[in-house]
């Protein structure tokens, strides 16, 4: 769905049609609900970054009343996540829905942070890859800028606690596993997932698709934290080696896609070296009854010198008569201005 700009004294972004109401949106097909949400959220994001005005959408359901039915839980969540501090005013005029946005300025006269749907900047939090919110992303990038980059390895604590020692032990076990050249089907492995270790089984014909889905955020998170290991072909539930069969995905094909994916990840530098993402990918043969039956894909990602994004930040503005996505350079400049 295209977003059009209406020629009026006030900036109006027309987001097309939308189904509104808490119950009505719950009964929608998931694909349609996501697409409508994405489109009107994109329009709102662009408007917030372009001053003031209105987002306009034609209401699909004819019996809708804003004061009675609400707008929809998914829309409320998405709108709040763009820029929580920005007040919004919802209005209905006949069969049209309006989101009114007033120009916002900080007390110091600056325009504040860019409204953003997704920073696409990840870090590790425990055993998970977590997207940074605007505040965390700003703090992370400013620290790197002040320091002129990040050291190749994290400085250890003077007195590491039990959690730090446990994570170090897990990483040592994962490093030893990474060095293996031969594995045995159904054999147990002795390390858990942690800040530096993640593993997946992906026993499916859609292995390549699943890897491509998780790889950007996992690599971004490891690179932006302290590096780490991703293993494909390990059963999370039973902590057993299962591997993946070559018929589901040839190792060379998977390796090529991993390389392509990592090289396409956006990065930003505040250092002089401007290095590329450092990683190593290998395939360990899995044996059963003496014969090779599957493979484990082992990926080691090094701590990055600056910042790695899973994708360009999803943030929009009105430019040259249309709704345009900020480049990563524009977004960072806006965020840190």
Language model features by range: what are they?
Residues 1-337:
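Conserved N-terminal catalytic/coupling substructures associated with nucleotide/phosphate chemistry
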């Amino acid at each position: 769905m295209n977003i059009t700009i209406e020629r009026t004294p006030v900036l109006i972004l027309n987001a097309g049609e939308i189904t509104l109401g808490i119950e009505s949106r719950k009964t929608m097909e998931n694909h349609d609900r996501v697409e409508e949400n994405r489109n009107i959220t994109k329009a709102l994001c662009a408007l917030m970054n372009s001053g003031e005005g209105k987002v306009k959408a034609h209401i699909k359901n004819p019996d809708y009343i804003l004061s009675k039915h609400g707008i929809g839980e998914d829309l409320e969540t998405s709108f709040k996540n763009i820029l929580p501090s920005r007040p919004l005013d919802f209005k209905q005029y006949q069969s049209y829905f309006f989101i009114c946005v007033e120009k916002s300025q900080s007390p110091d006269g600056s325009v504040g942070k860019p409204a953003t749907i997704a920073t696409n900047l990840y870090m590790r939090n425990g055993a998970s890859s977590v997207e940074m919110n605007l505040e965390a992303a700003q703090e992370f990038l400013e620290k790197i800028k002040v320091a002129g980059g990040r050291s190749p390895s994290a400085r250890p604590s003077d007195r590491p606690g039990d959690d730090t020692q446990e994570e170090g032990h897990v990483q040592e076990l994962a490093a030893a596993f990474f060095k293996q050249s031969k594995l045995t089907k159904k054999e147990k492995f002795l390390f858990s997932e942690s800040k530096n270790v993640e593993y997946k089984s992906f026993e499916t014909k859609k292995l390549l698709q699943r890897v491509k889905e998780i790889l950007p955020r996992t690599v971004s998170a490891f690179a932006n934290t302290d590096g780490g290991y991703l293993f494909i072909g390990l059963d999370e539930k039973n902590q057993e080696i299962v591997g993946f069969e070559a018929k589901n995905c040839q190792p060379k094909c998977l390796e090529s896609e991993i390389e392509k994916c990592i090289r396409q990840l956006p990065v930003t530098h505040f250092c002089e070296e401007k290095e590329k993402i450092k990683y190593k990918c290998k395939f360990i043969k899995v044996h059963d009854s003496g014969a090779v039956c599957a493979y484990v894909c082992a990926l080691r990602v090094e701590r990055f010198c600056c910042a790695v994004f899973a994708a360009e930040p999803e943030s929009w503005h009105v430019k040259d008569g249309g709704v345009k996505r900020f480049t990563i350079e524009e977004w960072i400049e806006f965020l840190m201005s």
